[in-house]
Amino acid sequence: MTGQHAAETGRAEELAELHDPLASSFPPSLTGRFLFWLAVVFSLYQIAIAAHVIDLPSQVMRAVHVGFLLALGYPLLALGRGFGTPLRALCWLFAAAGVAVAAYQWIEYTPLLFRAGDPNLPDLVFGCVAVVTVFVAAWMLMGPALPIICGLFLAYALFGQHLPPPFDHRGYAFEQVVEQIAYGTEGIYGIPTYVSATYIFLFILFGSFLEKAGMIRLFTDVSLGLVGHRTGGAAKVSVLSSGLMGTISGSGVANVVTTGQFTIPLMKRFGYRPAFAGGVEATSSMGGQIMPPVMGAVAFIMAETLGVQYIEVVKAALVPAILYFAGAFWMVHLEAGKRGLRGLSAEEMPSARNALREGWYLILPLAVLVWLLFSGYTPLFAGTIGLALTGMLILGTAIAMGMPSTAVRVIFWIVLGLCASAFFKFGIHALLLVLGVLIVTCAAFRGGRETLAICRDSLADGAKTALPVGIACALVGVIIGVMTLTGAANTFGQFIVSVGQDSLFLSLVLTMITCIILGMGIPTIPNYIITSSIAGPALLDLGVPLIVSHMFVFYFGILADLTPPVALACFAAAPIAKESGLKISFEAIKVAAAGFVVPFMAVYTPALMLQDGGALAGAVGYWPAVAYIVLKALIALALWGACVIGWLGRPLAMWERVIAVAAAFTLVAALPITDEIGFALTAVFAVLMWRGRTMVSA
């Protein structure tokens, strides 16, 4: 590692720590090494579960997953925050309590089934310990917002019978509430924890291995080679590389402080305003979570919640994601034109072809993963195979580098490829056998041992990265458990439906505001789970297709990280851009306009998310409806960009910008004759632009 690269890595960790107490590396102390190896064991356990090397009852598997999260999370938080001896001891006590709960769930699994509905005193004690340890871990890791929200739901379950109608319920005994929240599959160990223990953890590990293997460098070099030389190339590199990296990164905020270390200074150096540079990076990094084929962790929870294949979620997200990044590209292009910013020079750009020639093998696991997902395999199977192939490529590369000639290396890769294809006939165990042989071989020489160390570090880093996601999933299960027990979702849903009877648009705005307010203090995953559980059924009752209603909630949960006053992704970019987080947030909202507009358009015309239904599809047919709504969205985004930036080949007068925004708004609105008005205003605007250019050229 060069000194410059080491400095950049250290700077990235320092910035990440401002937003994530677990961002720093494992300390070199004895405690740090113990936690490092505990993280490795955690990852190996999850891989063994995914590959069915270890088969546990679903309830036990979830409990052990949460036990690992607490056992690793508390001590790491104590080290990361520099706690003194008393608080450190308390953290270790809470970690031990979390392990004890997992052990109790495992040992008492069968007796607990027989005692369902009639818990004894130890059940209640361990149930309370489970709730307390998860609440405290979430508070320490993510701040008070999510624990307070979950605490209010818990208080509602215990005391809601004292509220006035229609918010009251029949009342539930303390024992019943504890059993609902701490046992079974509708509380802490509900669907979110199941998804965390399977899909999410596996894909976080997959991303960790790819990052260690050099995927960030590959994405950056390819992006530079493809768009770096074009007008505003520095910002376009940010949009492309951050969006690509966001597809394999579990956190948009982490992506900001990782890729932003390179892209934000690059944009500033080529003339972009600091606030705009930070806004572009924040927008692109958050957009990675909605970009198929490998979307953020929420996509897996959505598929599991809706009971649909992952490919259906990908299909619904495809067109909106393309529009999101097309809008970002358009905005940075206009900003560059307005300020006369050129692309990068040839000397500063790597060759995209050379980058792919050198790192093409890194794309193979991602390609196989995508193929498996699109072929109907479960995300768990696809993620396991993708992770195994990544490990094989990393280890195989280390072995191939020591071979004497190109011919021998070619033969080696052919043989390894044939061995990898054996999983079609013999399953994952064939890949595990090949991996075992590669590990033993790498252990026999120095370069191989260094590669094994990289894999070991990837296992540890992946487990650490999964901690906030897993703990958030466990805690948000409290809300699901309370809503299932009390039927609280029906109360809010009836309110949404009553509003929607008069105006569907007002119902959508209310849901959007709920998502954004919740997202100001809690991560995307619990935000989605809460709002989809409460508002999703209501939107469905109003005639919104199921997957469209969930995508609506999903989008605004992500966009909450760009929305002031909290705007976590923007404040993560602030120290890099050396600009106010609020200023960056306002710029990010402009760049991310598509993210705010497309969900509304999709509700009225589901064809935008490649879904059946809607008046337009019924009138003109499915594919004509898709083409029409995409065209309308593109025109609206183009007009919005021209209005906001104030430039379209030339500076725009204020009245021209007013016409542009009026045309964009009427194209987006789903009211009688608004399309006709929008296209008429667009035609007027186009004539004005044509006349203006004619006068300039004359």
Locations of regions flagged by a protein language model:
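Hydrophobic transmembrane alpha-helices that form the pore/transport pathway of multi-pass ion
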Residues: 220-288, 294-301, 307, 524-556, ...
